[in-house]
Swiss-Prot record:
Example GO molecular function: ion channel inhibitor activity
Coiled coil location: none
Cross-referenced Pfam families: Toxin_12 (PF07740)
Localization: Secreted
Protein name as it appears in the record: Kappa-theraphotoxin-Cg1b
Main location: secreted
Free-text comment about domains: The presence of a 'disulfide through disulfide knot' structurally defines this protein as a knottin.
Function statement: Probable ion channel inhibitor.
Cystine bridges: C52-C66, C59-C71, C65-C78
Superkingdom classification of source: Eukaryota
Family: Belongs to the neurotoxin 10 (Hwtx-1) family. 28 (Jztx-11) subfamily.
Length: 86
């Protein structure tokens, strides 16, 4: 029983490697271009990211403040919104 299970797992492993190699060969140069494309996308997303305002930091809307903080409408600063958790 253990031997047949081991043989089955080995065959499945070989089939997985074979299918992966065939797919990699089919893609060709796409695989070579991917890292450069990912690097360019990384730069785009980093430029859009911005830090959140911490407690008592200046803000204009709630989304400026970090998690569990909200923008107070009168003095425009980030303060605890009364929530807990993640």
């Amino acid at each position: 029983m253990k031997v047949s299970l081991l043989i089955t797992l080995a065959v499945l492993g070989v089939m997985f490697v074979w299918a992966s190699a065939a797919e990699l060969q089919e893609r060709g140069s796409d695989q070579k271009d991917s890292p450069a494309w990912l690097k360019s996308m990384e730069r785009i997303f980093q430029s859009e990211e911005r830090e959140c305002k911490k407690m008592f930091g200046g803000c204009t809307v709630h989304s400026d403040c970090c998690a569990h903080l909200g923008c107070k409408p009168t003095l425009k600063y980030c303060a605890w919104d009364g929530t807990f958790g993640k």
